[in-house]
Amino acid sequence: SSAASDVYKRQLVCEVIDELDISGKTIAVEPVGCAVTAHNYFDFDVVQAAHGRAPAVATGIKRSLPDRVVFTYQGDGDLASIGTAETVHSAARGENITVIFINNTIYGMTGGQMAPTSLPGQVTQTSPYGRDPKIQGNPVRVCEMLATLDGPSYIARVSTDSVPHIKDAKRAIKKAFENQINGKGFSIVEVLSTCPTNWGMSPVEAMQRVRDEMIPYYPLGVFKDIEDVEEDK
């Protein structure tokens, strides 16, 4: 299921929090969507936000409790759709929060409808003949869009389809948390994920789809890192 495929991403987040020894001061903000039950897996404080509003809630918590480490954990149907305004403006302001963005190109919890990230030609409950860019528009590449802003400190897209990519994902997530600890501002890590149930695939087939279809459209890498800019000066 989508929720089951999401577990490993949560594990990476928890490993990073343990390694940084910050669980006692960490506050997570969970969305509406498959990650709405994230509090069952996190052994630290968790707040639930209204649909798409997690970055706004995280902003309020961080500004009122600046010594806490605050992060959101959101899917693409939450962050890239109803939450677009909150995502863009928290990034533009350079809010000192961390955003973990799980992109599986579909609305998982509500039964498999087309998301802003659904690929061209992708069959969903609301695009039964495949997404047609002429009718439903083109997918939103969140990292590339946010990288045009001055506010973010770190923007990366990763995947967990292979051991090397899992290691890269953990490094990116760790950096996103370290940036917040060091007061560097807004960081977002997009993690390409699967939803075997709503894709109508086996887990193995779904993982192959990530490699064959998602990564070519959503290339992995770092799209912005203020450390690179500082080193160039």
Go through the PLM ranges and name each one.
Residues 84-89, 109-123:
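Active-site-proximal loop->helix
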Residues 2, 181-233:
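Flexible, low-complexity linker and terminal segments
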Residues 45-47, 90, 115-119, 205-208:
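Short, hinge-like loop/turn segments at secondary-structure boundaries
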Residues 9, 21-38:
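N-terminal glycine-rich anion-binding loops that anchor highly charged ligand groups
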Residues 1-8:
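Short, small-residue-biased leader/transition segments that mark boundaries at the very start
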Residues 32-34, 104-106, 162, 190-198:
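Glycine-rich beta-alpha junction loops
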Residues 30-108, 171-175:
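Thiamine diphosphate
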Residues 67, 115-182:
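Conserved thiamine diphosphate
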